[in-house]
């Protein structure tokens, strides 16, 4: 892209929806998505570790209160949904919820803020700066998260039920007759594969659409501000809701994996 060219609305949107990447095709690495997701993960770990080390039984500070509210909320969600015995589920759910919430929250960052900051610091032409700061608007990130959940589902299904029990679950339901076992296997396999697929696409679709609408609003010009703030206010619901849905479905799927029929 020519650094001095004036962008049309379509070029402006396309530019902001393009990742900073190395490589091409399947082997392309999106450096911005990867960098922001790692950074926000470290922010989560640093804050929660710091609060845990400084926790007091006396009057807690505001940050400790906020962390305790989040931990209590996630713990209650796990207790009401997960009926197996696994000490990993609660911390896993907490990590998923807070990490995705932080990544989603990057959607509130004004679309031109980071490119202009990079331009101001480095002097790079704006047309050469690619920075997509919302990791969950990148399907590579959401599919990576969903793949991790899928691996845990398979692992605990085999660990709790054994290989034989897991295969029996795939072949003997919903139809009980032996002649329909192949049909059962196909149906159950499709159902199992649909779980991570739906997790990834739901999160990606909602955040990508949100980012796209912010960009469309930005093309209006100076008249964008009232609409921009209205959409940002609506995102106060969407951003935590998508993190909550991903967490709850993960808990449900892992609970099903722990059920030994």
Swiss-Prot record:
UniProt main location, coarse: membrane
Pfam family, one: ATP-synt_A
Signal sequence extent: none
Subcellular location: Cell inner membrane
PROSITE patterns, A to Z: ATPASE_A
Top-level taxon of the source organism: Bacteria
Residue spans crossing the bilayer: 28-48, 89-109, 140-160, 203-223, 229-249
InterPro entries referenced in this protein's UniProt entry, alphabetically: ATP_syn_F0_a_bact/chloroplast, ATP_synth_F0_asu, ATP_synth_F0_asu_AS, F0_ATP_A_sf
Molecular function terms from GO: proton-transporting ATP synthase activity, rotational mechanism
A single Gene Ontology CC term: plasma membrane
Biological process terms in GO annotation: proton motive force-driven plasma membrane ATP synthesis
Matches recorded under SUPFAM superfamilies: F1F0 ATP synthase subunit A (SSF81336)
Membrane topology: Multi-pass membrane protein
Keywords for the protein's UniProt record, in alphabetical order: ATP synthesis, Cell inner membrane, Cell membrane, CF(0), Hydrogen ion transport, Ion transport, Membrane, Transmembrane, Transmembrane helix, Transport
Function in brief: Key component of the proton channel; it plays a direct role in the translocation of protons across the membrane.
PANTHER family membership: ATP SYNTHASE SUBUNIT A, CHLOROPLASTIC
Family: Belongs to the ATPase A chain family.
The protein's assembly and partners: F-type ATPases have 2 components, CF(1) - the catalytic core - and CF(0) - the membrane proton channel. CF(1) has five subunits: alpha(3), beta(3), gamma(1), delta(1), epsilon(1). CF(0) has three main subunits: a(1), b(2) and c(9-12). The alpha and beta chains form an alternating ring which encloses part of the gamma chain. CF(1) is attached to CF(0) by a central stalk formed by the gamma and epsilon chains, while a peripheral stalk is formed by the delta and b chains.
Name of the featured protein: ATP synthase subunit a
Gene: atpB
